[in-house]
Amino acid sequence: MNEIEKEYAKLSKKFKLPKFKEIDNEFEISTLESPSFLMRDILRKIEDKLIFYIDVIGNLVHPDASSLSNMYEVRYFSDDEKDDIYNLFKKLMKVDRNIIEVVLKNDEKEQAAFLSKVFEDWMEIKKELLKYIVKMKESWEKQSTIEEDTAYFG
């Protein structure tokens, strides 16, 4: 058992946190370098992952016109799907901003409660994300030509 896992075990006993293996599997907390501010560092690790997905789906909600990949992928989503993606984007942003707030408050009990909640929420969010990530991937399997693709962009 490494230092991170030992410190997490203490915190878990004190605050009834999710199992180390489960949270590590999702957010790779065992890669943290120091157990000194473990709760805050775990939340920051979660935030790093959220920011990545916020960027990915944010590009579907508001694609960068200079990005060929963004413009290509977005055309495979219906308006209803884009609305759902926007709602997912908002959900991710809310979690991200909550992490920032909880870290700033520096209250370990509040951080622990939030960690448990965000882990539970993440398992549902992940399912939603996967649906859109798969569709993005599948868009690249569609047959098209460079002329068709670039003509679509104007």
What are these regions (language model features)?
Residues 1-154:
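Long, low-complexity or tandemly repetitive, helically biased scaffold regions used
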